Design a protein with these regions (language model features):
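Catalytic-pocket segment enriched in acidic/His residues
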Residues: 10, 48-51, 74, 150-226
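A generic local secondary-structure boundary/capping motif
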Residues: 4, 54-56, 77-79, 103-112, ...
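Residue-level "contact hotspot" at macromolecular interaction interfaces
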Residues: 58, 111, 224-226
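Ligand-binding beta-strand-loop-alpha-helix segment within the catalytic cores
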Residues: 116-118
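N-terminal non-catalytic cap/leader segment that marks the start of a structured domain
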Residues: 1-86, 179, 187, 196-198
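Structural signature of FAD isoalloxazine-binding scaffolds in flavoprotein oxidoreductases
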Residues: 82-99, 114
Length: 226
């Protein structure tokens, strides 16, 4: 199931994506009365063509807990080693934007980088979740761009300022509830003003240091996830 959050002239709604998203005119969004946290959508009876709506960030969480250096190759790019335990940091909700919204480069930075990530959406408040039980608290997954002011990150050593500027966390386009997080390609392709494009990031979640279940167990031992 694909869960989207979208805007129409009548307001903001959640909906279930049905059909081929590569054909926006025929792909539809069946409106639901609220985000189906339990995986059981309640339909309102209204439907919209994907081409008729504006997709928004699929969720607006209370906090974004991110994991750094979880890919061996990326850790090498930063000139550091991977860790026996997840390296976590928090991005504020004010970083979140939806698909197609411009990322604003802060005046303090001359180098802003993309970091394509698999984002885990938690379906309930939870604490001290065992890794073997982690699937129970996952609603689904979406795509995140952990935008980073790389020059600031390298100059300061700590990551909070470099990763917390407004617009520094694009999310979407929707939540995928039936997805295997252990084998997903993370591909970032940049399109230039002249129409040309190039692949800037090509990774697979099979290469992570810490799995989704291990990450949930670790973070929920520190703070409540909700």
């Amino acid at each position: 199931m694909r869960i989207a959050r979208f805007a129409t002239p009548d307001g903001v709604s959640f909906g279930i994506v049905e059909g081929d998203p590569d054909s926006p005119a025929t792909c539809t969004l069946r409106q639901v009365d609220e985000l189906p946290w339990d995986g059981q959508p309640v339909f309102t009876g209204k439907s919209f063509a994907l081409s008729e709506v504006r997709l928004l960030a699929p969720i607006f969480p209370t906090k974004i807990v991110a994991v750094g250096k979880n890919y061996i190759d990326h850790a090498k790019e930063l000139g550091s080693q991977t860790s026996d335990e997840p390296v976590i940091f928090i991005k504020p909700p004010t970083t979140i934007i939806g698909p197609g919204v411009p990322i604003r480069r802060p005046a303090a930075s001359q180098r802003v980088d993309h970091e394509g990530e698999l984002a885990i959406i938690i379906n309930q408040p939870c604490r001290n979740v065992d890794a073997m039980d982690a699937r129970r608290v996952i609603l689904g997954y979406t795509i995140a761009n952990d935008v980073t002011a790389r020059d600031i990150q390298r100059a300061e050593g700590q990551w909070t300022r470099a990763k917390s500027y407004d617009t520094f966390c694009p999310l979407g386009p929707w939540i995928e509830t039936q997805l295997d997080p252990s084998d997903q390609d993370i591909l970032v392709e940049v399109t230039h003003s002249d129409g040309s494009s190039e692949v800037r990031q090509d990774e697979n979640t099979a290469a992570v240091v810490h799995t989704v279940s291990e990450i949930i167990e670790f973070i929920s031992s520190v703070m409540t996830l909700l």
